[in-house]
């Protein structure tokens, strides 16, 4: 059976990290994706203790960034905390344009240079970095890396210790998606696969993601792409949604598990 991971963001509004861990382990889910700001709310000592008592492991650690000149000093502390939680990979949040910045090519070069510096630190600490391209409509304010093609090229230029995560919400539209997933797979760079859905209409680009099966994304088709490219990792549920956040977290996780088991089956 396909391994299912829940990203804490899916239920974070009504379940703190300790509650989230308990809800997952009660449902037989032993791997989670976590957030540094949620760790801070409950305390790192307690979070680590509960995680270890439950025998759980961490897939993704969210996150380092935004990658601005004044934030790079904080990056190493986040990487070190991710290492203490033994996260499989750490997400890079590039951020968008800086004040008075309008040249996209220059902004992207700035971010690429910053990623190189972060990678140097990550290698020393012993954690992997993950680039997750975000939808082009959030390029200006959230992420200057908008395509899997760009992410792959950055990884190729920088070498070991960095890979990509495919989030269907951000990549489903890309006509090069199959080719770029294959490219990442051939290089052993596919670190994660995130699922949710794109609703019609979408009321908010950040906080109106759908539960799998409620929207228009060809989820089975994209899952087949990552599997064919050699990805054997988990299916990770990451849903930013004011609708789902308002519901009982246990119910949300139960529905997510049921949808994943229906849609995604290991080949």
Regions found by a protein language model. Give the residues of each.
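Histidine-acidic metal/acid-base catalytic patches
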Residues: 1-5, 10-28, 80-87, 145-166, ...
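Active-site mouth loops of central-metabolism enzymes
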Residues: 3-16, 63-72, 101-107
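Active-site-proximal loop/turn and secondary-structure-junction residues that shape catalytic pockets
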Residues: 10-12, 36-40, 64-67, 94-98, ...
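N-terminal substrate-binding region of glycoside hydrolase catalytic domains
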Residues: 21-42, 62-67
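Glycine-rich, proline-tolerant flexible connector loops at the mouths of alpha/beta enzymes
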Residues: 33-53, 98, 102-103, 138-139
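Alpha-helix-loop-beta-strand connector modules within alpha/beta enzyme cores
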Residues: 47-64, 112-124, 149-158, 217-224
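Active-site acidic/histidine proton-transfer and metal-coordination neighborhood
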Residues: 68-163, 173-174, 248-251
């Amino acid at each position: 059976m396909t391994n299912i991971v829940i990203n804490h963001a899916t239920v974070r509004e009504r379940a703190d990290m300790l509650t989230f861990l308990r809800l997952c382990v009660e449902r037989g889910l032993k791997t989670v994706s976590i957030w540094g700001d949620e760790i801070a709310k409950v305390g790192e000592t307690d979070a680590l203790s509960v995680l270890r008592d439950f025998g759980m492991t961490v897939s993704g650690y969210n996150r380092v960034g935004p990658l601005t000149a004044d934030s790079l000093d904080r990056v190493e502390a986040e990487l070190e905390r991710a290492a203490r939680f033994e996260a499989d990979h750490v997400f890079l949040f590039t951020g968008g344009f800086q004040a008075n910045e309008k040249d996209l090519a220059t902004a992207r070069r700035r971010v690429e240079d910053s990623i190189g510096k972060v990678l140097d630190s990550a290698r020393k600490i012993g954690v992997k970095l993950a680039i997750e391209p975000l939808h082009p409509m959030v390029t200006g304010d959230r992420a200057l890396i908008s395509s899997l093609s760009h992410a792959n090229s950055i990884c190729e230029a920088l070498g070991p210790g960095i890979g990509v995560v495919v989030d269907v919400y951000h990549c489903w539209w890309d006509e090069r998606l199959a080719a770029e997933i294959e490219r990442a797979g051939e290089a052993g760079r596919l670190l994660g696969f995130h699922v949710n859905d794109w609703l019609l209409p979408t009321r908010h680009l950040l906080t109106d993601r759908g539960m799998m099966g409620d929207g228009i994304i060809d989820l089975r088709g994209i899952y087949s792409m990552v599997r064919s490219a050699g990805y054997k990792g988990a299916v990770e549920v990451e849903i930013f949604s004011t609708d789902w956040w308002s519901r009982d977290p246990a119910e949300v996780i139960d529905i997510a598990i049921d949808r994943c088991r229906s849609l995604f089956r290991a080949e």
